[in-house]
Amino acid sequence: MALETNTHRSYSIIPCFIFVELVIMAGTVLLSYYFECTDTFQVHIQGFFCQDGNLMKPYPGTEDESFISPLVLYCVLAATPTAIIFIGEVTTYFIKSTRENLIVQEKMILTGECCYLNPLFRRIIRFIGVFAFGLFATDIFVNAGQVVTGNLTPYFLTVCKPNYTASDCLIYHQFINSANICTGDPEVIEKARRSFPSKHAALSIYSALYATMYITSTIKTKSSRLAKPVLCLGTLCCAFLTGLNRVSEYRNHCVDVIGGFILGTAIALFLGLCVVHNFKGLYGAQCKPKPEDPRGVPLMAFPRVESPLETLSAQNHSSSMTEVT
């Protein structure tokens, strides 16, 4: 009887997951691949001034030479929230006090006539799957912004190596729109045209905020008041320092990092609040209190007015208690 109460039959969850969710996820990954690894989308050629001091910072080297290399960043971004969600869900499921609340929020799904989907399995797939989708979506938004704007990095003129003897650069305030004036490495120059928004800032704040929202909404610590805030603030601090590192190494402008923070924050909040509903169960949010039986409710209720006799008796009782003490 208890199994039937906590079981919900669904014939569409598996087909929807295979033919809708996985197809959307595959399309998102494929689009991200085209942005990252191909030249399908050409970067907008933005003009510049030959004597612009904001674009004359020293070349910091390739991305692999950065203090936070892309390989380390992507591994940490993907592994940290995944590990937190997996450990949190497994711990919540096997602790008796929290498992009862989980069973109320998440029902056992019966697909067809024989297959059961455990709430633990569904929550892990749901939360980690949405996180992975948001990670690729953030990467797409960042690449699209960089391709459309074509904002120049602080070291652009250093790698561009414009021909200062050309007629266009002889005039101090002449704005250059031609891409042929650069004499440096074309591959490095193209990367130097992708500054806004900062990819490191957007991905790091998205991952940190998603993990922070999961920790604050799911993990309960009754014995310690500071463990959860320290963990959340430490995660957000790492994302903040990642953005500052981009500015200190002259790889991005401050505006680029701020734009990346705003983009990553918006995507994390949207997915956390509107898609996974603040990491609450699907059925716990739909439970409504049972309406009160109207037969026992009076048609009209008036406020109770205390009579003078009751007031006098209460005063006499309090004075007698004072005399006794």
UniProtKB/Swiss-Prot annotation:
Glycosylation-annotated residues: 163, 316
GO terms under cellular component: neuron projection; plasma membrane
Superkingdom of this protein's organism: Eukaryota
Cellular localization per UniProt: Cell membrane; Cell projection, Neuron projection
Keywords of the record: Cell membrane, Cell projection, Glycoprotein, Membrane, Transmembrane, Transmembrane helix
One Pfam family hit: PAP2
Transmembrane segments: 11-31, 67-87, 127-147, 201-218, 230-247, 257-277
Entry membrane topology: Multi-pass membrane protein
Main subcellular localisation: membrane
GO BP terms in the entry: nervous system development; phospholipid metabolic process
Family of the protein in this entry: Belongs to the PA-phosphatase related phosphoesterase family.
Function comment: May play a role in neurite outgrowth and neurogenesis.
Name of the protein described by the UniProt record: Phospholipid phosphatase-related protein type 1
